[in-house]
Amino acid sequence: MRVLPLALLVGLLAVSDAKVLGKCEFARLLETRYNLSRNDIKNWVCIAEFESSFNTAATNRNRNRSTDYGIFQINNKYWCGSDYGKNVCGIPCSDLMSDDITAALRCAETVRRATERYRGRGKGYTAWVAYNSKCKKRDLDQYMAECWSRGSNSIFPF
């Protein structure tokens, strides 16, 4: 019986580490902290929304027994360190679930560049299922309109 309360406490602590960002908050972070271009921001925002709902601690177990981690849902079969995969990004998968998204963004860029080398220039985001099904054919400027002011390259609505 004492195991159940301990398990609940551990579960609550794990959940409390998660940070769920808002769409415009995430876009602002990508612009101000990481100095990304508007084109990159709109793609990463769309991917993050449909992969993780902007949850930095999201995980998803796949049919092939691999797991996707973090706000960009990066897979452990190739990209992050686990007993399962190749760890191309050179980081433990747990780093992808931090509230500080630096490691997740760096690894996501590694995935994008590697995919472009394999599939061709401009095809890097196709590594994400969400990009192919939700973002690729969407008007991403319209999608981001609530975050960006008109006629400006800034995402600040003033």
Swiss-Prot record:
User: Looking at the UniProt record for this protein, which Gene Ontology cellular component terms does it annotate, in alphabetical order?
Assistant: extracellular region
Family (UniProt): Belongs to the glycosyl hydrolase 22 family.
Residue intervals of the C-type lysozyme domain = 19-150
According to the record's subunit comment, the protein's assembly and interactions are: Monomer.
The terms under GO molecular function for this entry are: lysozyme activity
Where the protein is mainly located, per its record? Answer: secreted
Species name: Penaeus merguiensis (Banana prawn)
**PANTHER family for this protein:** LYSOZYME C (PTHR11407:SF63)
Q: Name its GO BP terms in alphabetical order.
A: defense response to Gram-negative bacterium; defense response to Gram-positive bacterium; killing of cells of another organism
Q: What is this protein called?
A: Lysozyme C
